[in-house]
């Protein structure tokens, strides 16, 4: 019987599963202390305040969890451990906040050997297995749909150059950099790239996430980082095709910077990908404008997600009355959470058509054969399964069936006009 079990809720759609797992643990081992944590748990812990959960970690877990385990071993009150919500009967007590953010250099590098037996299950896009690397944490920007800055208070922390170099050296050929704001700050990013080159690091593939304004204003970073991988993809938070739409989500950049960043990255030999937000309040002309923008500027590798008010964000707070009672499994960015302006049937017709214009559509400009030409022979079966599975995103009927099934749980409401504006 374990003394402590940790249950993760990294995303809002995992709240219910996390509670289910916690209850299973308690049913098997009633005396086990159950700690919930993860990004979603920390930024919006309310859905996890359930009978089977003993405490919720509401800050970085790297120092909180060892402190909690020590308190349990010494039988001292867990309410003395900073950064927790602790169940006490039917009430919850919030312990004192941590005095300062955890230094990333105080966090040990991942013990990846512990998951070697499952390594083949870690994959990203065409690349398998994949390794995750963190060089920084947090984001100082304040996008209305994003919970990262809310959790970390707009702070931004960096791991030291030497530690990052060692981490890159310890990983395999396919690396996903999990930073929310890669290439930032520019001076440190340039120093890091040079240190990695000096160490002789070169990967088969790297994927990093960044903002277009950071790249557009610092093209020298592209030159410095490009030698580090045979294929290097940059994922941009594209979000929208107009300045007005960017302003509505407080993106703090403009379309000109998006285009400048994409042009510079392509010219330097990078793959350009990213994501656009599809607003349920769109009219038909908004879909047409996005299609025209994608076609004109070559963003066919981008993805499209339905604008989703994630818990803990300003957008969630604004829409809370219309969202009341919606089940958490719908917060996957492919379900509707309020009644769309065009009605669900027409909305999904246009949403599916948007996906059909993407590179994932095997019936489009890039055929299935075209996809397989760039895949290693050993990966063909894997990528074929992935591509065939994604084809349901091109079918309005598949979305509509899921939508109607979900509405049996809770009907949608319209968003008040004042919130739409």
Residue ranges and their predicted role:
Residues 23, 34, 257-284, 382-383, ...:
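Mobile, glycine- and charge-enriched loop segments
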């Amino acid at each position: 019987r374990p003394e402590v079990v940790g249950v993760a809720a990294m995303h809002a759609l995992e709240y219910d599963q996390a509670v289910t797992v916690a209850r299973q643990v308690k049913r098997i081992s009633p005396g086990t202390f159950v700690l919930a944590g993860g990004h979603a748990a920390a930024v919006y812990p309310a859905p996890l305040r359930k009978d089977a959960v003993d405490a919720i970690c509401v800050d970085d877990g790297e120092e909180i969890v060892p402190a909690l385990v020590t308190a349990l071993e010494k039988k001292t009150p867990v309410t003395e451990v900073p950064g927790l919500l602790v169940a006490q009967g039917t009430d919850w007590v919030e312990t004192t906040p941590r005095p300062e953010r955890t230094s990333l250099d105080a966090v040990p590098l991942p013990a990846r050997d512990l998951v070697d037996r499952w390594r083949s299950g870690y994959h990203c896009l065409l690349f398998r297995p994949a390794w995750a690397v963190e060089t920084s944490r947090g984001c100082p920007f304040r996008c209305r749909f994003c919970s990262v800055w809310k959790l970390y208070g707009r702070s931004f922390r960096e791991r030291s150059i030497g530690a990052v170099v060692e981490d890159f050296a310890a990983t395999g050929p396919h690396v996903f950099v999990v930073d929310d704001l890669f290439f930032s700050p520019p001076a440190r990013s340039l120093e890091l790239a040079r240190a990695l080159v000096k160490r002789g690091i070169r990967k088969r593939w790297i994927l990093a996430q960044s903002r277009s304004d950071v790249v557009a204003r610092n093209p020298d970073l592209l030159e410095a980082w490009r030698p580090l991988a045979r294929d290097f993809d940059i994922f941009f938070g594209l979000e929208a095709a107009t300045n007005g739409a960017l302003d509505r989500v407080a993106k703090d950049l403009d379309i000109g910077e998006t285009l400048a960043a994409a042009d510079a990255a392509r010219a330097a030999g990078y793959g350009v990908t990213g994501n656009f937000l599809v607003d349920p309040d769109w009219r038909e002309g908004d879909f047409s404008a996005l299609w025209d923008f994608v076609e004109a500027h070559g963003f066919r590798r981008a993805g499209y997600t339905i604008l989703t008010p994630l818990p803990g964000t300003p957008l969630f707070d604004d829409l809370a009355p219309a969202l009341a009672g919606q089940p958490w499994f719908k917060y996957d960015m492919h379900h509707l959470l309020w009644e769309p302006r065009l009605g669900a049937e027409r909305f999904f017709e246009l949403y599916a058509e948007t996906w059909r214009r993407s590179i994932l559509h095997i019936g489009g400009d890039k055929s299935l054969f075209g996809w397989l030409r760039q895949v290693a022979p050993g990966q063909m079966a894997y990528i074929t399964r992935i591509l065939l599975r994604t084809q349901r995103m091109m079918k309005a009927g598949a979305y509509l069936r899921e939508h109607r099934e979900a509405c049996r749980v809770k009907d949608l409401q319209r968003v008040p006009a004042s919130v739409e504006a």
